[in-house]
Each structure stands twice: as C-alpha cells, then as structure tokens.
Amino acid sequence: IIEELRCESNKGFKLIPPFEIVISRNKVVVDLGTLTDAYEKEITIHTTATSKDGEKTILAGKDVTIIDTVKLDGLKKGTKYQLKGWQMLKEENAELIINNKRVENDYTFVADAEAMKVEIAYTFNASALGGKSLVTFEELYDLSNPEEPVKVAEHKDIDDDGQTVLITERI
C-alpha cells in the first residue's frame, strides 16, 4: 500500500488517496508515472455585523442583538461544519465579557452548497457599553471527525469596518 503523509511541502494540497500495488514477478520495475496533489480549495469567510434592523449603530440597553451575516465560500458539500463567533471590544482589542462569560455563539450546519450564507445572533446586556465599538470574530471548524474538529478558516480583523458595530449611549 502506498500512502502519502501530510507534511510541510504538501500543505494546502489534497492528499493522494492510498492505493495498493501487487508485484508478482522478481526484477520488475513498475513506473507509477508522476503522482501529483490537487490544490485544496481554500475556504473564505466574509462577514457583516449589524443590528437587527441592518444598522451599524445600536442604542445601549439591556437586550441588544447583533446579527452577524457570514458568507462562506469553498465549502465541501455534505460536510458538517461549526461556525463559532464572539464579540471583541475594538479599543481594548479584548474579548467582551459580561457576567464573567464571553459573549459568544455558534452555528452547526451541513454544507448543501460550496458557497453559503449563514447568520449568528448575539444577544446581551449592553447597558454599560455606550460609546464602545464591538467587532465580531469567527472561526469555522470541519466536524467530519466530531472527536477532533479541524479549524479550516477564521476571520479575526479588529479593524474591519464590516465586522464592527458602534453601541451609542442613551441621551
């Protein structure tokens, strides 16, 4: 059996599936030709964070919701994925913690197309966040093996305006 192993030089490539060769005569040379790996399609994430109304500003309050619309491209049809996201305080470049817990959410789905759009909602108490900018970060995991999820993409740009929502103070 000939099996290609993952290493630095084939990173980003789809491995050749293992195959078996049976040689039944002595002193025979078997020419396998050139075995090449195909490029693995890279998964990309593009996101837009807004209020429920599609606005980039939200009035501070006890029950604030940010909707994160995530466009994914390069998915493998039929594969189970989990999208994990959380809120960051832009000015501090730190996770948003409320009541000793990170403001986070996740969404698990099976890809029915190579390109998909999904939404994650974050609802939390933003009473004390007037004047703060919040940025949504995401990581996408392949759950083909539920025992060992594999991170396949991430979008963590603290300066991305598309991922940023401003919490305004009540007047």
Question: Where are these predicted regions, by residue range?
Answer:
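Solvent-exposed loop/turn and edge beta-strand elements of beta-rich ligand-binding domains
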Residues: 1-171
